[in-house]
Each structure stands twice: as C-alpha cells, then as structure tokens.
Amino acid sequence: MSSLVTQINFNKINNSQSTVKDYILLMKPRVMSLVIFTGFVGMWLAPDSIHPLIAGIAVICIALGAGSAGAMNMWYDRDIDILMKRTQNRPIVRGVIEPDEALSFGLITGFFAVFFMALCVNILASFLLLFTIFYYICIYTIWLKRRSIQNIVIGGVSGALPPVIGHAAVSNTISLESIILFLIIFIWTPPHSWAIALFCNDDYKHCKIPMMPVVKGTLYTKKQILIYSIILFIVSLMPFFIGMNNDIYLIIVCIIGLVFLYYAFSLFYDTPDNKQAKRFFTYSIFYLCFIFILLSSTSTIHSLRDIIFG
C-alpha cells in the first residue's frame, strides 16, 4: 500500500491548484450538512430560549467542528482513500491539498470552533464539541476503523452527538430529550453504514478495513442491519412516549418506520449482487432527515396550538 502511495506521490501535489472548493470538500460537506441539520434540530427542541446571534454562532461552531474532524480524517486516511473508488476524488488524493496543510487546516478550524463555542455560547457545548472531534479522530479514525468489526457501532458516538451539542448550546444541560435524539442517530448509524459496506465490499476488502461484510460475510451483515432496524423503529417512538411530540408524530413515524423495515427485510432477502443495499442506503438518509424534520415541525405545531387555544 505504501509503495503505491509513494509511486503516484498523491498526483504530484501542486499548491497553486488549491481552491476554496477543495477546502470545502476537505471538510466532507455532505456529512457536515447532516451534522448542522441535526445540531440545529437539537437547538430548536430545547425548552429554553437563545438570542438568534448566539444561535447562529453555535451552528457555525458545530459546522466548523464537523469540518475540522472531516479534514483530519482525510489526512489520516489518505493512504486508503487512494485505493477506494468512492474516495479517489478527495482533495489530498487528487493532489490539490498537501497532507500537512490538511492537518493544519483541521486543527486550526477545530480550535476556533471549540474556542468560540466556549466564548460565545457556553462551556458545556464547547466541551461536547471538543469531545466529538476527539472521539471521531482518535477513537474512531485512528483506533477503531482499521482494527475492529465494531468500528461503526462504537465510532457512531461522535456522529450522534451534534443534537446533544445543539440542545446544550441553548439549555446548558444534557436532558432526556437530547439523549433520545442521540439514540436515534446512534442506532441509525450501523445499518446505514453497513449498507454502504455491502455495495463497497471489494474496496473495504482491498484496503483490509474490517467492516462487517468483510469479516462476517454478507448474510450476517444483513441480519445485523435487520436487528438494528427493528431497534431503531422502537427507539423512534420514544419522543412520543416521553411527551416530546404528539399523536401526529407517532402516526407518521410509524409509517416511515414500517417502510424502513420493509427495505431492511427486502435487503435481507436480496440477491447476492446486493442491489437492494443502495436502495436501503438512500432511504435511510431520507428516513433520518424526515424524523428530525418531523420532530421539529410537530413540536412547533403543538406549541402554537397550546398558545392559541390555551
């Protein structure tokens, strides 16, 4: 692997080719957008109020924190990114950003995100943001990803924390509501990620990354996806049962949850080419986004109804 990296020399890096777009790509914008969205919903659902300017700063800090983690992840994984089809177009691999520049960018961006969260918002939100960045880089990227079949499960903690950070930015506490938001994302992450691993199995095998399909095989992975999908369906009902949301939420979340289970069962009985894995993966993104939209919208409607009708 190292000889291959040396041979192509990261496409003969040329600093003059670096653009703002390349640095945005370095921050994993698709992942970052989901982090921003779930973090914002965490803020929206917090019972306390926050000044719009402070809220804006908190969202920017969450975004920069996610971006810094993405940049440092690309810095560390550059040797395997170059071997995988779905990551061969990343900025470091293409040679438009040097590895050292990517690391410096990630560290500086992360520092400012944590610093301004502490200065302008509160210490708890800042600490949670720092912990999230640390966990994603040190625990998941460096320690677990290349060593453990449970890399996605344990590493999923970092991806599930943004709504907790957002909630803490407003309330300065970690509440039951924010923990439930955490659990929804935490349980959602393994089946979502294992679906990717199914249709990118050859890439992971080539890079010797111990994803579940590589180590345990396709059938075992599909069983785990199905189990986690059932657990996720149950967890998604919790906001209703603790009074976070109303019966509208319950009805809609049951419908989209049953569709999620349908895709999970379809994947379990899928043909060996795993065509259903891509469909499951696509729907899983829609499912998570829709749940968080539903949480914020039904909560708002419920609050307005209470204000209008007492």
From Swiss-Prot:
- For the protein in the UniProt heading, the enzyme class is transferase
Keyword annotations from UniProtKB, A to Z:
Cell inner membrane, Cell membrane, Heme biosynthesis, Membrane, Transferase, Transmembrane, Transmembrane helix
Protein's cellular compartments? Cell inner membrane
Q: Mark the transmembrane ranges.
A: 31-51, 52-72, 102-119, 123-145, 151-171, 179-199, 225-245, 248-268, 281-301
Keyword Protein biosynthesis assigned to the entry: answer is no
In the record, biological process GO terms are: heme O biosynthetic process
Q: Which GO terms describe its cellular component?
A: plasma membrane
Q: What is its EC number?
A: 2.5.1.141
Reactions accelerated catalytically: heme b + (2E,6E)-farnesyl diphosphate + H2O = Fe(II)-heme o + diphosphate
Gene3D superfamilies recorded: UbiA prenyltransferase
Q: Does the keyword Translocase apply?
A: no
Tell me the Pfam families matching this sequence. UbiA
Which superkingdom? Answer: Bacteria
Recorded GO molecular functions are: protoheme IX farnesyltransferase activity
Give the pathway: Porphyrin-containing compound metabolism; heme O biosynthesis; heme O from protoheme: step 1/1
Its biological purpose is as follows: Converts heme B (protoheme IX) to heme O by substitution of the vinyl group on carbon 2 of heme B porphyrin ring with a hydroxyethyl farnesyl side group.
The record's family statement is: Belongs to the UbiA prenyltransferase family. Protoheme IX farnesyltransferase subfamily.
Miscellaneous? Carbon 2 of the heme B porphyrin ring is defined according to the Fischer nomenclature.
Q: What is this protein called?
A: Protoheme IX farnesyltransferase
